[in-house]
Design a protein with these regions (language model features):
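Alpha-helical transmembrane segments of multi-pass membrane proteins
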Residues: 2-252, 262-266
Length: 266
């Protein structure tokens, strides 16, 4: 039985920074998209279903971007999973390539948006494609968290994070088990940081778009680049448990290995 080595504290901290940056990215691009691209939710993709329902109820014509955003998101997720499967077959770690793909998609969205002028036609092809590139970038971000950062909270949808955060606070307050309380505290910290990052991103995105319009997409694009640079510099390959938990897990695994060898010798 192979025993995994404990992750370094530096790598774990770098990963937390990447996750916070991704949360700010999602919050900012969602606010900018909603305010500047005709009510398009780029990160919180299911919000577009509410927008569509509202238009249908009012017997209004729904924007094309809102109509196609959900199918585009699903296709982008599927393509990302196929790409990840191909990288896995080549024994390539997934986090950094997926962060690069996200950055490139956001860059494409930024280029199309600013190329359309200060007041782009939201029904024009370039504006719609720009929005869908943003949606695809958030699909990649959602996928990389699920595939490569499995122990991490969502960086795009905060409802689950808020639920987890409050439940973990309840677990800490109940104090039924010291070990469970420590784990709940660690989960609450990660969920809380993701929530805070998203809220900060929403505020920054809303503020920037009010001043510089669609040039504000430089913010999420730049944050995605910083996250990629950190991941490359720290050689991050995916999620890792907090070092103290990893050491406990490693110790348990080593004990199990010794026990297995003992029984094999009987």
């Amino acid at each position: 039985m192979r025993v995994a080595s404990a992750p370094s504290a530096d790598n774990w901290r770098a990963l937390q920074v990447v996750l916070i940056l991704l949360s700010i990215t999602a919050g900012s691009v969602d606010a900018i998209g909603f305010l500047r691209l005709g009510g398009l939710f780029i990160a919180h993709i299911t919000g577009n279903l509410v927008i569509l329902a509202a238009h249908l109820a009012a017997d209004d014509e729904a924007p094309l971007a809102n109509i196609i955003s959900f199918p585009v998101f699903i296709v982008a997720l599927a393509v990302t999973r196929l790409l990840a499967a191909g990288l896995e077959r080549m024994h390539v770690t997934l986090l950094r390539p997926l962060l690069l793909l996200q950055f490139l998609l956001l860059t494409g969205s930024l280029a199309l948006c600013v190329g359309g002028g200060s007041r782009p036609d939201l029904n024009a092809a370039n504006a719609i494609v720009a929005g869908m590139l943003g949606v695809s970038a958030m699909a990649v971000q959602n996928a990389l968290v699920q595939i490569s950062l499995k122990e991490s909270p969502s960086t795009c949808v905060m409802t689950t994070n808020t639920t987890r955060f409050v439940l973990d606070l309840g677990e800490i307050l109940l104090g039924r088990s010291r070990n469970d309380g420590v784990k709940a505290g660690e989960r609450a910290k990660r969920s809380g940081l993701a929530i805070a990052g998203f809220v900060v991103g929403c505020g920054l995105g809303a503020g920037c778009q009010a001043v510089i319009g669609l040039w504000s997409l430089v913010l999420p694009t730049g944050l995605a680049l910083v996250a990629l640079v950190i991941a490359v510099a720290a050689k991050l390959d995916g999620t890792q448990a907090h070092p103290c938990f990893a050491q406990r897990t490693t110790g348990k695994a080593a004990s199990a290995t010794k026990a297995g060898r003992h029984f094999d010798g009987l």
